[in-house]
Amino acid sequence: MNCSAFSFWFVCKIIFFFLSFNIQISIANPQENFLKCFSEYIPNNPANPKFIYTQHDQLYMSVLNSTIQNLRFTSDTTPKPLVIVTPSNVSHIQASILCSKKVGLQIRTRSGGHDAEGLSYISQVPFAIVDLRNMHTVKVDIHSQTAWVEAGATLGEVYYWINEMNENFSFPGGYCPTVGVGGHFSGGGYGALMRNYGLAADNIIDAHLVNVDGKVLDRKSMGEDLFWAIRGGGGENFGIIAAWKIKLVVVPSKATIFSVKKNMEIHGLVKLFNKWQNIAYKYDKDLMLTTHFRTRNITDNHGKNKTTVHGYFSSIFLGGVDSLVDLMNKSFPELGIKKTDCKELSWIDTTIFYSGVVNYNTANFKKEILLDRSAGKKTAFSIKLDYVKKLIPETAMVKILEKLYEEEVGVGMYVLYPYGGIMDEISESAIPFPHRAGIMYELWYTATWEKQEDNEKHINWVRSVYNFTTPYVSQNPRLAYLNYRDLDLGKTNPESPNNYTQARIWGEKYFGKNFNRLVKVKTKADPNNFFRNEQSIPPLPPHHH
């Protein structure tokens, strides 16, 4: 080998060594590289509040756990993010996306932390969390009957600020005030006004989305296909939602509620249930009559602890007490509703009554409770949901209720919400959420518990109920709801860029015939599948474009 050839070979080897070393450093230190990249977009200013946390920060675990609503996912073995970004403006979101792409981190976007499977803050591969807690402004314009809501706001904040501006307006979102609007709206979002006004997603008229290239898009610039997709198809599949523009709805100055408990043997509860399932979805849209069954631990006459099951029937009626009592006595006399069972409340007070975070009868509360993001007790839980299209036979419902007595239940509950009303009139393709005409009610099964070591036992109990009810619920496919995400339906490999065949199995359960349109939108908006998780919408493989 001559000298010049040797020199060239030596130089090439040195270059290759340094390139390899740099690549190894890049792979070994994605956290440091993310911080370096972020500082290039957003120069560090010590005067600004801290909004980036790494595993070396004292507040890291506090920030991470603060909005994890399901205590199943707070164990030491739960995968943790390398970085948590808590943006205070859109530029922080843009930098988070661009830097995550650059250093090879996946992104999980968290609004309120209620994801049933924890996918808004858990990944099996290296990841960063974009936690939107600091972006929670609600700007209400009563003149146009609209509001811009940042995606980190909670439902409680939305209801509170609308009510502050005008108590005759509200928004048709869910019951739980600590749920974040980022996920709730983008998955559909049902609640007390569903039979009047449809879902939360049916009442969204604009949005700000930060896409895979870090660009901020509104409805006009994103186009109608992408705007359609983020309202019920899961916004996290297409980018990060920064804000929603919502259409306010009119509510009466007073509404009437009742919530009655029925403590009787199972056959008596089933008789009431059967009457409920025959009529609840047929009522005028001004009445939402729900029911739920739950376990209670009581002490019998001999001082022994035992489990019993109580039934509860609860209403929200957009009218007066006399009208509601008259309606119930004519249509559902078995329930025995009396005037003394009812309360006439302002709309905001009905929201608080059904919020689950206060005891309305004993608490000295104000509507400011809706602003408390930590209201309510956190537990570990598991949940599955079904849609019912035909009456469940009484004999079957007896056996379903009997499962609440099984030892593995923890605190078990079945909750049933009637559909019908305007839900029957909205096309199943209006937004990606397809569960409209033909759905009588939704039925969900849940167990809650305290100890981490009991996780598997109680999760398996919920699975056993779900398996038992198979013949009595929707079929071919068995329908599901994105906001009650269920990884038992199937999951894709988040490291794999193309998972269409796998994803179709669960995608058609969530979205029905809308799944293929979502895939086409994804293929155009995020062809390399940067925004992905175990149940994300996949793009089509390149040869299928």
Curated annotation (Swiss-Prot):
User: Where do the annotations place cannabigerolate binding?
Assistant: 292, 417, 442
Which Pfam family name is an example for this entry?
BBE
The residues annotated as the active site are: 484 (proton acceptor)
Pathway listed for it is: Secondary metabolite biosynthesis; terpenoid biosynthesis
Signal peptide position in this chain?
A: 1-28
Glycosylation site positions: 65, 89, 168, 297, 305, 329, 467, 499
Known Gene3D superfamilies for this protein? 3.30.465.10, 3.40.462.20, Uridine Diphospho-n-acetylenolpyruvylglucosamine Reductase, domain 2 (3.30.43.10)
Q: Which domain of life is it from?
A: Eukaryota
Entry-linked InterPro entries: BBE, FAD-bd_PCMH, FAD-bd_PCMH-like_sf, FAD-bd_PCMH_sub1, FAD-bd_PCMH_sub2, Oxid_FAD_bind_N
Its annotated function is as follows:
Oxidoreductase involved in the biosynthesis of cannabinoids-related terpenophenolic natural products, which have pharmacological activity. Catalyzes the oxidative cyclization of the monoterpene moiety in cannabigerolic acid (CBGA) producing cannabichromenic acid (CBCA), which exhibits anti-inflammatory, antifungal and antimicrobial effects. Can also use cannabinerolic acid (CBNRA) as substrate. Unable to catalyze the production of delta(9)-tetrahydrocannabinolate (THCA), the precursor of Delta(1)-tetrahydrocannabinol.
Please give the PANTHER family that the UniProt record associates with this protein.
OS08G0158400 PROTEIN
Protein name, UniProt field? Cannabichromenic acid synthase
The scientific name of the source species is Cannabis sativa
Q: List the taxonomic lineage.
A: Eukaryota, Viridiplantae, Streptophyta, Embryophyta, Tracheophyta
What is the name of the gene encoding this protein? CBCAS
